[in-house]
Regions:
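HhH-family (HhH-GPD) DNA N-glycosylase catalytic core used in base-excision repair
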Residues: 1-182
C-alpha cells in the first residue's frame, strides 16, 4: 500500500497528491468514500423526475457545476428537472438542455464530462478542477488538455498506490485541499 518510491521516479503532482492522502484524517477518508455515491443519488433523483437515464441525470448535474458550490449546483439541477427557471451562467443551461438528448456527449469540457461520469458511477473518472490544480501546485487554475491529462494520470497513479479508486482519491484530495466536502 505505502510503497517507497524514489522521489526522482514520480512527478511533482504525484508527490503532492500522495502527501495530501497521507495527511488525510479518518473523517476526510469517510467523506471521500461516500461523496460520489451521494452525488449519484442526486443524479438518480433528477433522472427519475425527468423519466430518463442516470447518464442524463448525471450530465445535467454536472452541467450546472462550473463556478458553483455543490449546494447551489444541486438546487439548480433539481430546478431544471422540475421545469423551473434556473439563473446563472447561460452556457451551463445550454449544456443541461443538450444533456437531455446527448447525455455525456453534451459535455465537451474534460472537467464536466469526467464529473458526470464519476457521478454516474465510473470509478476511474478523475475530475480536475481549480482545487485539484492547486493541490498539484499547477501553474494555472484552468488546465490545458495536456495538463489535465497529466494531473488525472497522477491521481490514478496515487490512487493505485493507496488501494483507492481514482474517483475516491480525487474526492479525498479535493476535500483536503478545499477544506470541506461542500
Amino acid at each position: 500500500m505505502n510503497t517507497i518510491i524514489h522521489p526522482m521516479e514520480i512527478t511533482t503532482a504525484e508527490y503532492l497528491y500522495n502527501n495530501c492522502i497521507l495527511q488525510a484524517t479518518l473523517a476526510q477518508v469517510e467523506q471521500a468514500s461516500v461523496w460520489y455515491f451521494e452525488a449519484q443519488e442526486v443524479a438518480e433523483d433528477v433522472a427519475e423526475i425527468l423519466g430518463t437515464s442516470l447518464e442524463v441525470g448525471a450530465s445535467i448535474v454536472s452541467a450546472f457545476s462550473p463556478r458553483e458550490r455543490w449546494a447551489s449546483n444541486v438546487a439548480k439541477a433539481y430546478a431544471f428537472a422540475n421545469g423551473k427557471p434556473v439563473a446563472g451562467l447561460s452556457n451551463n443551461l445550454k449544456m443541461a438542455n443538450a444533456a437531455l438528448e446527448q447525455g455525456f456527449d453534451a459535455l465537451k469540457g474534460q472537467k464536466t464530462n469526467a464529473f458526470a461520469r464519476a457521478i454516474a458511477g465510473d470509478t476511474n473518472a478523475v475530475v480536475i478542477d481549480v482545487w485539484m490544480c492547486r493541490a498539484a501546485n499547477a501553474p494555472t487554475d484552468s488546465p490545458s488538455k495536456g495538463l489535465y491529462n497529466t494531473l488525472s494520470d497522477a491521481v490514478t497513479s496515487v490512487a493505485n498506490e493507496h488501494g483507492l479508486s481514482p474517483r475516491t482519491a480525487q474526492a479525498l484530495i479535493w476535500i483536503i485541499k478545499r477544506g470541506s466536502a461542500e
